C-alpha cells in the first residue's frame, strides 16, 4: 500500500500537471523568436488558429488569467502590438510550477508589452472596465477544484472578471470536455468540465455566448480519463467558447 507521503506527492504532482504551461524542463527564450517549446505546443494547442477566432486588434488590453507559463500571452502580445498590453496572471499556487518559465519568457524585457501580474484569485486587482478581452485557458474547471491550498470563491471570481471587462468586452474559455450532462462531476479528479454547464453558468452571470468552435474537438477522447494520461495528453477533446459582457 502506498505510504501517506507518496499519496500526497502524487496528489501534488497531479495538480501541478494541470496548470497551463506546466513544464518539467527549463525553456530557453530568445528575443524576437518563439521558443522551440512553444512551436512544439502549436501542433496540439493550435494557438494561432485560436487567435483567429477572436477579434484582437492593436492597442487592446488583454488579461491571460491563470495563464501559466505564458504561451498565449506571447501570441496575444504580437497581435496587439505595439501599444496594446497583456497581463500575464498567475497566483501563488501556480508560481512554483510556472514561475521559472514566466521569468525566462519575460527576461530582459523580451516581451515589452507583457506585464507580469501575480495576484490571488480573491483580489485580481484589475481596474474596472479596463480590459478588452480575457483569456481563461484550461482553467475554468479549477474554480471547482478544492484542495488544501486551493479553493476559489467562484461567484466572486467570475464577478471580478466581468467587472474588469469593458462594456462589450470578450471572455474566451477553453477547457477539457467532460461527458455531456456531467456538470462539474469530473472537475475535481479528472480536471474536466461539461461545456453546457459552463455556458449555463456564465449566461446566469450576465454573459452572452457569441461563438463556439470545434477547432480542438477530438472524438477519440472518451472524456472520462485525465488530460494527463499518456494516451490523451495534449490531445484532449476541448471546447472553445467566446462570451461577451
Annotate each language-model stretch with its function.
Residues 26-53, 57:
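Class I SAM-dependent methyltransferase Rossmann-like catalytic core
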Residues 124-138:
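A short acidic, Gly/Pro-enriched loop at the edge of an enzyme's catalytic core
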Residues 98-124:
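S-adenosyl-L-methionine
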Residues 77-78, 149-167:
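A short glycine-rich, Lys/Arg-flanked "PGG" loop and its adjoining helix->strand segment in the class I
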Residues 183-210:
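Conserved Class I S-adenosyl-L-methionine
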Residues 59-68:
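Conserved class I S-adenosyl-L-methionine
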Residues 59, 82-84, 165-171:
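Short glycine-dipeptide loop
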Residues 205, 220-245:
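Core SAM-dependent methyltransferase catalytic element
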